[in-house]
């Protein structure tokens, strides 16, 4: 059991039989009242957020959270197959767990598989990936700076907004956290 006073961002706990990730935790004490710990928790299976206030004397059950480095191999039906780099074991991850992150899967890309109680609950990608632009409208001469953006389709099927000077065939760096353009990469 983990005292709620020790809760930190990134901890995984079990609450009412479900696993939650601590997004935020603040110790709060009003005058002449008991101290509380106010938390924001994310349900690891459903993805919804809740806010919960604990008495400072409470304890919660700590979940077994771990990460394993893996390499993407191929898609099979509605799941994706990864190989654990430590022991070469193959793991199937459902499309529901990946969600729109599937657009960052390139052959042999390395990711971190998040496990809670020996079950894959999430896939963490590198913060930036480099992808090639397969379609975008042509830019105009002189459009080298500015904040005007246009849509571009990338090699994996994802569409991101890019500056006007980006052309078909350019390689760009994309932020996987918010699907945004970062910069053009030299070939």
From Swiss-Prot:
* Primary localisation category: cytoplasm
**GO cellular component terms, A-Z:** cytoplasm
- A molecular-function term among this protein's GO annotations: translation elongation factor activity
Q: What SUPFAM superfamilies does the entry give?
A: Nucleic acid-binding proteins, Translation proteins SH3-like domain
Q: Which InterPro entries match?
A: Elong-fact-P_C, NA-bd_OB-fold, Rib_uL2_dom2, Transl_elong_fac_P/YeiP, Transl_elong_KOW-like, Transl_elong_P/YeiP_cen, Transl_elong_P/YeiP_CS, Transl_elongation_fac_P
Pathway assigned to this chain's UniProt record = Protein biosynthesis; polypeptide chain elongation
GO biological process: one example: peptide biosynthetic process
The subcellular localization recorded is: Cytoplasm
- Give the keywords, sorted: Cytoplasm, Elongation factor, Protein biosynthesis
State the Pfam families in the record. Answer: EFP, EFP_N, Elong-fact-P_C
Q: Which top-level group of life is the source organism from?
A: Bacteria
This protein's record includes keyword Aminoacyl-tRNA synthetase: no
PROSITE patterns named among the record's database cross-references: EFP
Q: Which SMART domains match?
A: EFP (SM01185), Elong-fact-P_C (SM00841)
Q: Which NCBIfam families match?
A: efp (TIGR00038), PRK00529.1 (NF001810)
Q: What does this protein do?
A: Involved in peptide bond synthesis. Stimulates efficient translation and peptide-bond synthesis on native or reconstituted 70S ribosomes in vitro. Probably functions indirectly by altering the affinity of the ribosome for aminoacyl-tRNA, thus increasing their reactivity as acceptors for peptidyl transferase.
Q: Which family does it belong to?
A: Belongs to the elongation factor P family.
Q: What is this protein called?
A: Elongation factor P
Q: Which organism is it from?
A: Brachyspira hyodysenteriae (strain ATCC 49526 / WA1)
Source organism lineage? Bacteria, Pseudomonadati, Spirochaetota, Spirochaetia, Brachyspirales
